[in-house]
C-alpha cells in the first residue's frame, strides 16, 4: 500500500513540475482560433505562416 501511495505522490509531483515548467504564453495558436485567442487584448489578430499574432 505504501508503494502505491509513493507512486501517486511521485505522479502528482511530476504533474505540478510540468505545470510550472510549461509556459502558457508561448502556446501555438492556429489561424482558426486566432480571433478568439486575441479577443479582450485590444489587438488586431493576424495569421503569419499558420501562427496567430495578436499585434497589440
UniProtKB/Swiss-Prot annotation:
Chain ranges passing through the membrane: none
Bridged cysteine pairs (disulfide): 31-47, 34-52, 38-54
SUPFAM superfamilies per record: Scorpion toxin-like (SSF57095)
Keyword Transcription regulation: no
InterPro entries in alphabetical order: Scorpion_toxin-like_sf, Toxin_alpha-KTx_8/9
Signal peptide (UniProt feature, chain positions): 1-28
Family: Belongs to the short scorpion toxin superfamily. Potassium channel inhibitor family. Alpha-KTx 09 subfamily.
UniProt function note: Blocks small conductance calcium-activated potassium channels (KCNN, SK). Low toxicity by intracerebroventricular injection into mice.
Protein name in UniProt: Potassium channel toxin alpha-KTx 9.2
Organism for this UniProt entry: Olivierus martensii (Manchurian scorpion)
Amino acid at each position: 500500500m505504501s508503494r502505491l501511495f509513493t507512486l501517486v505522490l511521485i505522479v502528482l509531483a511530476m504533474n505540478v513540475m510540468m505545470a510550472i515548467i510549461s509556459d502558457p504564453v508561448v502556446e501555438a495558436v492556429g489561424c482558426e482560433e486566432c480571433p478568439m485567442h486575441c479577443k479582450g487584448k485590444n489587438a488586431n489578430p493576424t495569421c503569419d505562416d499558420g501562427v496567430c499574432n495578436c499585434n497589440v
